Every structure is written in structure tokens, then in C-alpha cells.
From Swiss-Prot:
This is N-acetyllactosaminide alpha-1,3-galactosyltransferase-like 1. The lineage of its organism: Eukaryota, Metazoa, Chordata, Craniata, Vertebrata. It comes from the Eukaryota. Its main location: Golgi. It holds the Pfam family Glyco_transf_6. The conserved DXD motif is involved in cofactor binding. The manganese ion interacts with the beta-phosphate group of UDP and may also have a role in catalysis. Gene3D superfamilies: Spore Coat Polysaccharide Biosynthesis Protein SpsA, Chain A. Residues 27-319 are lumenal.
Length: 319
């Protein structure tokens, strides 16, 4: 009799364990299936030369020293990439921080324009990280668009908003985002989409050129020049000056960037140095070269006189 009870308990435990594993790992399983589909088709990914031609824009820098494309209007054929990515049924995440006054009209304008122009025809998840999720505007989204809101958790003794935001983003990527999307962008809320922002921008790591500093000489870039700072770049070094407005890539690459930023800013705080997110961003891309570089057309400040190199503004920046 005792043996039968023990056998029944053992069977019950096995069933419960199987059910727990089934539901606990269902999200991971779905994500792995997506990754497998991408991996299976990886050999068919269009070669850069089939969709990108830097010779069509001899008036600008269209290829980096490490042979990554710098995307300008006229250099890329989006249709070639569409044929590839449509087969994979990918999902792209777009994360934005809505704090203080930016949680109302600027956020509404950003999401409304992103809904119209960001990755049209693809599954998109908008992630809003806000001080409070109760007073956010109402958003009416188009097909294939979903929205998630999270409240930013506070940190004791943390007076740096960027550090708080990145710590929150770090947690969300680990807990959730990495299982939901194939590519992830983090964008500043104070900008408005003006034209299609498409799959030509997708890559393992994506950096945005700063509209103002693109037309300046490298020796004038506002890199961190203090040797004791983790963001230090010597005067004779550097490639471009990147803007904090847009950062992207695979979730794990974005996660790595965030981790390096948190480490760098923490080290600087220990050394009693005040440094900016953008200085650490530039140090990161100085060491870890981006796979895609977005030209100033993808983030242009309309206050500037528009030079002839800027043919088609994708996003307007509003400081």
C-alpha cells in the first residue's frame, strides 16, 4: 500500500514538473523557433552588394573604414531586403523613455509618427518606459502594432536619469524583450518620423551619425578627453561622432552596449568624474564598430540649414 502511494506521488510530481516546464519555457521555445528560422535562412541573406551601392552617392561618406554601409538616400534597395525579411516573419522592438514633460505631447507625437512610418508591414512592439503609466496619452495603433508600458523603477542614490533609464532597460531586455523581438531600437522621444524608416536599418548593431558633427572635423568632436574617464578617446583617434537619439541592433548587442555604459559610468562616478551617456556611447562604438551606420538623413535637426547632401529626411530632431 505504501509503495502504491509513493508511486502515485512520484507520477504526480513528474506530471507537475512537465507542466511547469511546458509553461515556463513556452515563451523561450517560441523565441528559439524564431531564431532557428532566421538561422536556417541565414545563408540566403542578401549580400551587401545586392542591395547597397555607395557609388551612387559620391558626394558623401557612404562606407566606413571597416566596410559597414552608411545609409543615405539612393544608396540602398529596400525591396531586395524586403524579400528576405518578409519570409522570416520578424518582430522589431522600439523602446522609448517618457519622463517628465516628455510623457504627454512629445510621446504622443513620437508614437503617432512611428506608427505611420516605422517598419511598415512588419510586426512591431512599442515599449514605453515612463515615470507613471497612469497618465500616458491614448494611442490608436495600426495593424501589426502592439504597445507595452512599464513604470520606471526608482533607484536609491541615483541622480543620473540616463543611468536609471539604462538600468531599467537592462532589466527589461533580460526579462522580456529578448524573447519577443529579433531587432531592437532605443530612441529619444523628442523626435518625429517624417518618412519611412525601413529594414535597411536592421543589423547586429546600429549607430546614428550626429547631424551637427558629421560636417565637422574629427579633431573637433566633443569626445571625452579626460584620460581618467572610462569614455576617454585620444585626440588623434575616432571615426565619427554618434548621436544618442537612435541606437539599435539585436537585443543582445543592445544589452551589451547598456552593460558597457553602466560599467563605464559607474567607474567614472567612483573616480568622481561626471560623464555623459553620449560620451560612453561614442567610446563603445569606437571599440565595437557598428554594422550599420545611419546618415544624418535619419535624424536631422530642422533648425539647421539643410545642405545638398541631405536628400530625404527620415526623422526630425527636436532638442
Amino acid at each position: 500500500m505504501q509503495y502504491k502511494k509513493e508511486a502515485l506521488l512520484l507520477m504526480l510530481f513528474a506530471v507537475l514538473l512537465a507542466l511547469t516546464q511546458r509553461f515556463s519555457y513556452s515563451r523561450t521555445k517560441d523565441h528559439l523557433q524564431k531564431m532557428y528560422a532566421c538561422w536556417k535562412d541565414h545563408l540566403e541573406e542578401p549580400h551587401l552588394s545586392t542591395w547597397f551601392d555607395p557609388k551612387k552617392r559620391p558626394d558623401v561618406i557612404a562606407t566606413t573604414g571597416w566596410l559597414a554601409p552608411v545609409l543615405w538616400e539612393g544608396t540602398y534597395n529596400r525591396e531586395v531586403l524586403e524579400q528576405y525579411y518578409k519570409r522570416l516573419n520578424i518582430t522589431i522592438g522600439l523602446a522609448v523613455f517618457a519622463t517628465g514633460n516628455f510623457s504627454k505631447e512629445p510621446l504622443r507625437r513620437f508614437i503617432k509618427s512611428a506608427d505611420k512610418y516605422f517598419m511598415v508591414g512588419y510586426n512591431v512592439i512599442f515599449y514605453i518606459l515612463a515615470d507613471s503609466t497612469y497618465n500616458l496619452p491614448y494611442f490608436e495603433l495600426g495593424p501589426l502594432r502592439t504597445l507595452k508600458t512599464w513604470r520606471l523603477f526608482e533607484e536609491e542614490m541615483c541622480q543620473d536619469c540616463n543611468l536609471r533609464n539604462m538600468n531599467n532597460m537592462h532589466s527589461k531586455i533580460i526579462q522580456c524583450i529578448q524573447y519577443e523581438v529579433n531587432f531592437l531600437f532605443m530612441m529619444a522621444v523628442n523626435q518625429t518620423f517624417k518618412n519611412n524608416f525601413g529594414v535597411e536599418t536592421l543589423g547586429k548593431s546600429v549607430a546614428q551619425l550626429h547631424a551637427w558633427w558629421y560636417f565637422k572635423k574629427p579633431r573637433d568632436f566633443p569626445y571625452e578627453r579626460r584620460t581618467k574617464s572610462a569614455a576617454f578617446i585620444p585626440f588623434e583617434k575616432g571615426d565619427f561622432y554618434y548621436h544618442r537619439a537612435i541606437v539599435g541592433g539585436t537585443p543582445l548587442n543592445v544589452l551589451n552596449l547598456i552593460e558597457q555604459y553602466i560599467k563605464g559610468i559607474t567607474d567614472d562616478n567612483t573616480n568622481k568624474l561626471v560623464s555623459t551617456f553620449e560620451s560612453h556611447l561614442n567610446k563603445y562604438f569606437f571599440i565595437n564598430k557598428p554594422a550599420r551606420v545611419l546618415s544624418p538623413e535619419y535624424n536631422w535637426d530642422p533648425r539647421f540649414k539643410t545642405p545638398p547632401e541631405i536628400k530625404h529626411i527620415k526623422i526630425a530632431w527636436k532638442p
